[in-house]
Amino acid sequence: MFTIKGCLNRICIRYSGQSEVEEQYSGSLYSVVGLLRDLYHTIQNINRTSQPVMVFGEEGTCKEQAVNYLYLQSDWWDSPLVVVDCFLLNTKGWSYLMNHHNSPLTRSECTIFIKNIDVLTSDQRGQLLANIIAMNVHKMNRLIFSCVCKKDEAMPDAGVEFVEVMSCLTLYLPPLRQRVEKFPAIVNMYLSHLNTTMTKQVSGIEAEAMRKLQKFDWPRNYSQFQRIVKELAMMTEQPYITAEAVEEVLKREGSVVPVGDRGEDTEAPLDLNRTLQEINRDIVLRTLERENGNQSRTAERLGISRTTLWRMLKN
């Protein structure tokens, strides 16, 4: 049965094994186009130690996929990966994390990824750090944190606080606009991947269409890029993606995604002052985006059938 409580538990605190993490990463943009290739040596050096890690970057830089890769390349790959999303923790969820005997903080020999620590209040950050230290969580597990920095700004103070207290190593994920020279290769590799998942084939993209993509600001970075290119590929009725199609999509995108909006890394908290149907649909949409549009994995994570998922999306 689909319930808010069950769904929130699956989204806020998630446990995954190696095979599930491999599946998630292999279908991600980072894996498909090799975005972490430039950071390979940095990641290898980080994994030579058991020090806590702080992953940071702008919104939409797919930090969770970078953490998946970090986990898979580490000596902890055969133990569970636990993901705690601070942004989706309500009062009960926070109390569970801090006080419950089954809290992830009571685990041992796990990789624990606590994401979006920058959305916590100062008191919450202090409580979390105090519990981690008092319970030796960092000595019994591999700890990874993440935070979001604003455009062209350094790590936020919340992230710096954790880095200093926990002696974290840091992994910075550059924004998409810093890879403009690699844009044609990234687009074409992703289109090749999409061709394996669609019933039609897209041969490529017009030169002017590529220039328009390169000039776009991409405020939500890779998560926005992946969604837009996938939409262009699925909607085109021609062998190539045209400049007109790109212009239309980007114009619409600019009107609904303002610069500075928080992307996949920090979703807006659930508004519970709505009907049950509206809240359920919001949860489904968030999970669908996390699963890169894969309806089968979304239904499995939410504990519902694909038919139920389809009906909830349609309503």
Language-model regions: role of each:
Residues T42-D118, P175-V180:
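Conserved post-Walker A coupling segment in P-loop NTPases
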